[in-house]
């Protein structure tokens, strides 16, 4: 699937040109627009990893506790990878199928991030679109929004034929920490990406079983579960 095909598919969902390109700019930063891309720290070949995931003989959901990002959006949380894999199975396609992944990303945003989805379908601010996808949907450990925005600009020029609507974007604010009452899935995503938001006495090691248990306990408390 070409970048033009991905762009057209996103536009058919009602995304503005700026929002489609903002989302694609994030995909470019996450995976270089490769739907079979597995996170580099896995040390695994993309095709080999995908074949294992499709075979059912590999722990695709958690990567045996190592939690590798995968696909266009580098889905990492077990719950999200499970939904991605189930969607692929229902369609009878590989988990690397580009059309399926685009549809899945749209489904996630429209159902789990309704405010972001509203922005996706109404905003004509390319920088804001790119920034909000990064902060709300992707939540990377390193924001690198400038690189995402440059990629979004390139897509906008190539696919929408427009000029940069915001050539001098304002400095990017840091995303806010989780707040009491937030949905637990959002708290979990924030905690997984930004260790700095954790109370010091609740961090015990890095990505250990105790650490993951602390994440769930802390997120449940903040979400009021």
Predicted regions and their residues:
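Solvent-exposed, acidic/flexible segments
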Residues: 3, 16-20, 65-68, 94-102, ...
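Short acidic, glycine/serine/threonine-rich helix-capping segments at coil-helix boundaries
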Residues: 175-186, 190-225
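Surface-exposed patches in mature extracellular/periplasmic domains of secreted proteins
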Residues: 14-24, 35-42, 115-125, 129, ...
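Export/targeting segments at the very N-terminus of extracytoplasmic proteins
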Residues: 1-33
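Peptidoglycan-targeting cell-wall enzymes and recognition modules
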Residues: 5, 31-121
């Amino acid at each position: 699937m070409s970048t033009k095909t991905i762009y057209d598919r996103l536009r058919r969902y009602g995304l503005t040109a700026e929002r489609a390109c903002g989302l694609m700019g994030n995909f470019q930063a996450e995976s270089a627009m490769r739907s079979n891309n597995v996170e580099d720290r896995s040390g695994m070949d993309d095709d080999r990893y995908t074949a294992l995931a499709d075979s059912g003989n590999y722990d695709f959901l958690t990567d045996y506790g190592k939690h590798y990002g995968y696909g266009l959006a580098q889905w990492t949380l077990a719950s999200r990878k499970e939904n991605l894999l189930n969607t692929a199975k229902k369609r009878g396609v590989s988990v690397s199928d580009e059309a399926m992944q685009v549809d899945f990303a749209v489904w996630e945003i429209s159902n789990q991030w309704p405010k972001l989805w509203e922005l996706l379908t109404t905003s004509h601010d390319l920088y804001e679109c790119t920034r909000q996808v990064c902060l709300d949907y992707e939540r990377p450990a390193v924001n690198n929004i400038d690189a995402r925005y440059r990629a979004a600009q390139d897509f906008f020029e190539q696919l929408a034929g427009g000029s940069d609507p915001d050539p001098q974007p304002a400095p990017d604010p840091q995303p806010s920490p989780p707040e009491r009452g937030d949905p637990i899935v959002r708290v979990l995503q924030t905690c997984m990406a930004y260790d700095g938001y954790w109370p010091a006495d609740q961090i015990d090691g890095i990505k250990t079983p105790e650490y993951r248990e602390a994440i769930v306990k802390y997120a449940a408390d903040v979400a009021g579960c």
